[in-house]
Amino acid sequence: MRNAIATVLLGLAMLLPVGAVQAQDGPLRIEITDGVIEPLPFAVPDFIADTPAAAQYATDIARVIAQDLVGSGLFREIPKVAYISPYTDFDAEVNFTDWKAINAQALIAGAVSLSGDRITVRFRGYDVFAGQELGAGLQLSGTTDGWRRIAHKVADTIYSRLTGEGGYFDSRVVFVSETGPKNDRKKRLAIMDYDGANVQYLTNSDAIVLAPRFSPTGDRVLYTSYESGFPQIHVLDVGRVQRRVLSAGNGSMSFAPRFAPNGQTIVYSQSQGGNTDLFSMDINSGNPQRLTSAPSIETAPSFSPDGSQIVFESDRSGTSQLYVMSASGGEAKRISFGQGRYGTPVWSPRGDYIAFTKQNAGRFHIGVMRTDGSEERLLTASFLDEGPTWSPNGRVIMFTRETQGASGQARLYSVDISGRNLKPVKTPDGASDPSWSPLQN
């Protein structure tokens, strides 16, 4: 069962033609025929509420779990109108025959109880055709205003048990919220759940903000602000919404920051005297270290997961291309050789791919390549796609898509690394420059 779906994900990652896969330890399966995924059908009845006050939470939690799994593209929810018998008792023995009859290959069952402002959720997953649980049942608790996080955690658990890979639902995205006409657009930092819920604004000035980037622990955000009249790097504590300037003065402009995996070092671009190079800095000491020294423009740096290397874009060859070098500087190796211009590279948290923006023949693309530049694949194509960011499990990419025309509205989209399951991400206003957090604790 788990082997079947894990094999599917491996096939997606390697983009190999995969036929129907039969699990060795049960009948649960996902079919891939000629590169088309056959989502696994599952049922998630409304969770059982112990009191009338818990009823809405029970319904909403089941709904969010289903949305998470369906949104991954690997699962298909069976409509509740197809259920043969109602689900009314969490502790009763499951009637697998009724669920088999509607071809529910997985069943997710749960119960919700309230005590003051606290909510407790118990849940179990079942392999219907094998007639057994998908691992031990679990219990999660929290405050009632955190019920969505509990739902995401349940979905992550089910996703992980069925695929053998980490989930990505209990995560957040920081981005630039855009309002107003194109020639007078207000840009604010905002943060939300990965699915667009619970939007909060982190800045509220008229100064332009760009390129927010999460720390490895998700509690801080680097970004570029024009509050002083020229670009400077700020770091913001998400929980307390406190910020401080990390780069300032000396006639230089600093931008495109990103954290190292250790959370204490940052790498960024600095422009001075008409030249743009890469620098690193310890955020506690504030002492910069030059990493490149060339007459070309070096920008958009991103660390490898182990912190040993940096990928960045440079026009040293005459056009914008991607290069990899040691995190301490030194000789850089070019890894992009296709037609067009490359930019905004970002290393996958798994370490296996680098995502990038490509411009060629009047179109923009989000693509991925191996870390040595091999196996380049373009996942999207439009008037303007740019700025990829990886999900915590390295299987999904979120990016900015801007529409053509006078309004030039920017929105967020996501796509899996096979190029399938392209879809918009819900935001209340225009949105750009996303950065995906790690899974929350």
Swiss-Prot record:
Residues 1-23 form the signal peptide. GO terms for cellular component: periplasmic space. It comes from the Bacteria. GO terms for biological process: cell division; protein import. Keywords: Cell cycle, Cell division, Periplasm, Signal. SUPFAM superfamilies: TolB, N-terminal domain, Tricorn protease N-terminal domain. Residues 420-441 are annotated as: Disordered. The keyword Cell division applies. It is found in: Periplasm. Belongs to the TolB family. NCBIfam families: propeller_TolB (TIGR02800). The Tol-Pal system is composed of five core proteins: the inner membrane proteins TolA, TolQ and TolR, the periplasmic protein TolB and the outer membrane protein Pal. They form a network linking the inner and outer membranes and the peptidoglycan layer. PANTHER family: PROTEIN TOLB, PROTEIN TOLB HOMOLOG. Part of the Tol-Pal system, which plays a role in outer membrane invagination during cell division and is important for maintaining outer membrane integrity. This is Tol-Pal system protein TolB. The lineage of its organism: Bacteria, Pseudomonadati, Pseudomonadota, Alphaproteobacteria, Rhodobacterales.
